Every structure is written in structure tokens, then in C-alpha cells.
């Protein structure tokens, strides 16, 4: 893997062929997730659910459409990976969100290497977080809140090198 090559090609993919992710691809994605750092090494504070059942994906999509008034917020991807964490309720503690984000980015980069499309998902996750029946269907443990997700799947949308503007993020260098 060439990390910079993957970083400069990674993008949000929103079109999918519907071809399922293979068992080998899933295993490699999960290995990338397991390699992610988690605050203070507290891996028991985060859980991951891999959703491939079409009926569950449809239910999540429907919940998101109902809440946000937009159809197909999962873009027809055959896989949704949901990250849920124990939130402490303290606004100053964002480690749960940060942990999910690091896992999602590892998954994103692995998807690039595997030639799979991927897109970081928030709207459907927000809808899922408010639907106790769906959380139960996804076997999200009591006390955990869905905080991030990634759709993954085969796509005809190829990864090509992007020109990333310098200073895209306002930056101050204090030396």
C-alpha cells in the first residue's frame, strides 16, 4: 500500500453496482478497522456492526428518508458499517466520535486499496440513533449510540488522482 497514493485518490463514492462485497474483501476491511487507534486503548467503548442484509439496509434507508426527506441516503450500497460508542454525555468528551472517525478513515483507505467504493455516512446514522427497534435489529448493545458509518461496495466510479488544493483547511504554522 502506498498511503499517499490512497489518500490522494480517496473520495466519496455515491454510485454502486449492487454486487456484494466478497468474504475476502470484508475480512480485509475488518482488519483495517481493527488496526485503528482508539482513545486510551479502550476498545470496549466502541462496537461495529456490518450490515449486508438487504431488508435491514432498506429499513435504515427508510428511517433516514423519513427523518430527512431524502431517498436513498445509503446510495444503494450493499454494505453499511455502523460504528457505535458509549457516549458519556459530557460535551467536552468527543472521544467516541473521534474513535469512530479513525475507524471509518481506515476503512475508507482500505476500500481504495481494494478498489471498492465507499462513502462516510451521517444522515442515516443520525436516524438510526433515534430508532430503538432498528438499533436492536442491528444488535447494537444497550448504552451504545451509533455515531458514524461507511457504505461500501463495488462501483464503476474509479479512483483517480485528485488535485488537492494547498491550504484547503485554514492552517496556522507556529514556529
Where are the predicted features?
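N-terminal amphipathic, basic helical "cap/leader" segment at the start of enzyme domains
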Residues: 1-79, 175
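C-terminal helix-cap and adjacent tail motif
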Residues: 6-13, 17-22, 140, 145-175
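Small-aliphatic-rich amphipathic alpha-helix that forms the alpha element of a beta-alpha
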Residues: 33-34, 81, 89-134
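Solvent-exposed alpha-helices and their adjacent loops that cap or buttress functional pockets
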Residues: 40-43, 72-75, 138-144, 163-166
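Proline- and acidic/polar-enriched loop/turn elements at helix boundaries
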Residues: 45, 123, 146-147
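Short, charged/polar surface micro-motifs in flexible loops or helix N-caps
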Residues: 53-58, 87-89, 132, 156
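Short, solvent-exposed amphipathic alpha-helical segments in soluble enzyme
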Residues: 65-67, 97-99, 166-168
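Active-site-flanking beta-strand signature of metal-NTP-handling nucleotidyl enzymes
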Residues: 80-84, 150
Amino acid at each position: 500500500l502506498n498511503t499517499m497514493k490512497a489518500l490522494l485518490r480517496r473520495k466519496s463514492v455515491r454510485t454502486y453496482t449492487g454486487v456484494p462485497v466478497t468474504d475476502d474483501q470484508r475480512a480485509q476491511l475488518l482488519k483495517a478497522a481493527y488496526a485503528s487507534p482508539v482513545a486510551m486503548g479502550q476498545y470496549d467503548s466502541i462496537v461495529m456492526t456490518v450490515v449486508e442484509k438487504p431488508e435491514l439496509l432498506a429499513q435504515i434507508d427508510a428511517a433516514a428518508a423519513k427523518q430527512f426527506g431524502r431517498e436513498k441516503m445509503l446510495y444503494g450500497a450493499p454494505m453499511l458499517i455502523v460504528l457505535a460508542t458509549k457516549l458519556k454525555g459530557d460535551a467536552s468528551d468527543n472521544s467516541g466520535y473521534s474513535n469512530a472517525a479513525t475507524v471509518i478513515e481506515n476503512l475508507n483507505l482500505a476500500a481504495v486499496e481494494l478498489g471498492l467504493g465507499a462513502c462516510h455516512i451521517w444522515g442515516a446514522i443520525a436516524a438510526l440513533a433515534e430508532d430503538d427497534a432498528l438499533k436492536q435489529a442491528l444488535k447494537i448493545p444497550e448504552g451504545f449510540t451509533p455515531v458514524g458509518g461507511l457504505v461500501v461496495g463495488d462501483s464503476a466510479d474509479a479512483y483517480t488522482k485528485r488535485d488537492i488544493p494547498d491550504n484547503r483547511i485554514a492552517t496556522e504554522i507556529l514556529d
